[in-house]
């Protein structure tokens, strides 16, 4: 639980302003007795309390915030910006420049932050085969024609992902996301242990299928959960997250040059993201669309 305390020396107009519910980063409702509760905003818990000592024409106001962010995985990046936004109230109803155009509630914030974390894994799985298959070809002693065929074969996984996207409509986004992450990480590790180019190629087909499945379901999930005015913003942030994951492959690529076999180490990196699977399954609710479909069929 985070705490923030601000002391104001205000005139009557300033007191009226600070005593009204906020409608910027957070939307409040007046709970009475100088307390304001959360209507909408990126918080699991939120309360604003005013303590007022008045004199003729002047008011000493102690404003206290108690809150807990509903931003998993990336919450530490937003601690200071959110404290700054709470300290500097906006009366025009707009959010800070770094926030989405629409107000995101606890559910949407939690879902979107988790999807961004999954996008890191998706970006890594997408770029790892492209950046390392030449190193694998050198170790397995295959020619350039075989490398080209390998690259074409791997991309079959993108087509296979269509079937898994259909399964997500029937069995839920959350479940298929979990399976796709699990298979992507497992077969990335199997690719690292491949004894031949054929097994390596087969593993990468599964990795590509898992990654494409993640990409499709993440986009659909985000579009279903984000407000209409924030969907373009959301897709842009998901793209940035995936690019960061892809960049991780490039940053670690020098490892592949240490020895003929050292490219394999890059494919073990997704093991570090295993906690993401359990966290995503625990924190992600099912999408509203699937939830409504289940309710109708019940």
Residues covered by each model-derived region:
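Central cavity-lining transmembrane alpha-helices of secondary-active solute carriers
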Residues: 151-166, 215, 219
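Cytoplasmic helix-loop-helix junction between adjacent transmembrane helices
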Residues: 203-240
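Helix-breaking motifs and short loop linkers at transmembrane-helix boundaries and internal kinks
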Residues: 141, 172, 193-198, 210, ...
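Helix-loop junctions at membrane interfaces in 12-TM secondary transporters
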Residues: 192-203, 259-260
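Glycine-rich segments within core transmembrane alpha-helices of 12-TM secondary carriers
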Residues: 230-258, 273
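Extracytoplasmic
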Residues: 111-144
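Structural signature of the two symmetry-related core transmembrane helices
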Residues: 175-190
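Symmetry-related core transmembrane helices of the 12-TM Major Facilitator Superfamily/SLC fold
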Residues: 263-282
């Amino acid at each position: 639980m985070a705490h923030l305390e601000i002391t104001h020396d205000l005139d009557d107009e300033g007191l009226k302003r600070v005593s009204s519910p906020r409608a910027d980063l957070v939307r409040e409702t007046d709970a009475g007795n100088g307390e304001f509760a959360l209507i909408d905003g990126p918080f699991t818990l939120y309360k604003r309390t005013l303590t007022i000592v008045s004199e003729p024409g002047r008011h000493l106001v102690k404003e206290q915030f108690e809150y807990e962010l509903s931003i998993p995985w990336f919450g530490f990046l937003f601690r200071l910006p959110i404290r700054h936004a709470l300290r500097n109230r906006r009366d025009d109803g707009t959010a800070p420049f770094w926030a989405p155009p629409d107000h995101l509630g606890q559910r949407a914030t939690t879902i979107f932050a988790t999807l961004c974390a999954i996008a890191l894994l998706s970006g890594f799985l997408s770029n790892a085969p492209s950046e390392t298959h030449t190193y694998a070809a050198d170790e397995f002693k295959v020619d350039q024609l075989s490398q080209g065929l390998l690259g074409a074969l791997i991309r079959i996984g993108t087509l296979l992902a269509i079937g898994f996207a259909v399964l997500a409509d029937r069995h839920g986004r959350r479940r298929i996301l979990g399976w796709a992450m699990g298979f992507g990480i497992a077969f990335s590790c199997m690719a690292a242990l491949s004894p031949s180019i054929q097994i390596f190629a087969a593993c990468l087909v599964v990795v590509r299928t898992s990654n494409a499945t993640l990409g499709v379901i993440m986009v659909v999930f985000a579009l279903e959960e984000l407000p209409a005015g924030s969907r373009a913003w959301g897709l842009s942030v998901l793209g940035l997250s995936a690019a960061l994951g892809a960049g991780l492959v490039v940053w670690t690529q020098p490892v592949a040059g240490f020895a003929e076999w050292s490219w394999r180490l890059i494919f073990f990196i997704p093991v570090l993201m295993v906690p993401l699977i359990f966290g995503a399954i625990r924190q992600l609710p099912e999408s509203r669309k699937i939830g409504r479909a289940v309710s109708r069929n019940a």
